[in-house]
Amino acid sequence: MNLQKIAMGLGLSIALVACSKDEETIVVPVSAITVKDLAADTVTGLGLDGRPQSALTTTYYSLVDNKAIASTDAASTKWDIAFSSTKILINGGTSGPGIGGAFVHIGSFDSFTSIPADSIFKTDNANAASYAIPLGSGKAWYTYDGLTTLVSPIAGRVLVIRTATGKYAKIEIISYYKGGVTLPSTASVNDKLFKQRYYTFRYAYQPNGSKTF
């Protein structure tokens, strides 16, 4: 009888441990969040050289809390990414005190469900004009057409982000213009000028520290 009780107890313990291990490996998919019309150093007018003028501001954003962060907290780890015109910064390297990093994945947002183990996260290095999310037309998330003066997100480009505190997120830029629209080449000069630098994007943030979405 005692042996039976011991055996039953051991069996129950093993079953509980097995269940516990199974529960630890369960990954709950995260839902995508859409951010609309996030202003990013919006245009105030044209300079004498015909170039757009602005206040040269930067908009800081927390992917953890899904909200803009005050510029007075730029030297903190409260923000994860920042926007200024077409430039996107991460909280790491020369851009901030965090351990953030990023790389650009070529593929669809929905099908990118896990970060490969051999992925290399780059950091910002403003001194060398090198950024985790590269600057320039065709290099990361957008193209610029000099004839139409329009900025267009590139389909199938996913920004993979390591946040300021070491968690992970993925981002897809949907629109660069107010209202989340794609401006036609025939849009007015005023629309092209003053509706730009308003980001609409969607992102998925994994709060548990894993690299699976």
Residue ranges and their predicted role:
Residues 20-213:
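Surface-exposed, beta-sheet-biased, low-hydrophobicity segments with strongly acidic/polar composition
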Residues 15-18:
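C-terminal motif of bacterial Sec signal peptides marking the signal peptidase cleavage site
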Residues 1-7:
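Bacterial N-terminal signal peptides that target proteins for export
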Residues 8-12:
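Hydrophobic alpha-helical targeting segments used for export or membrane insertion
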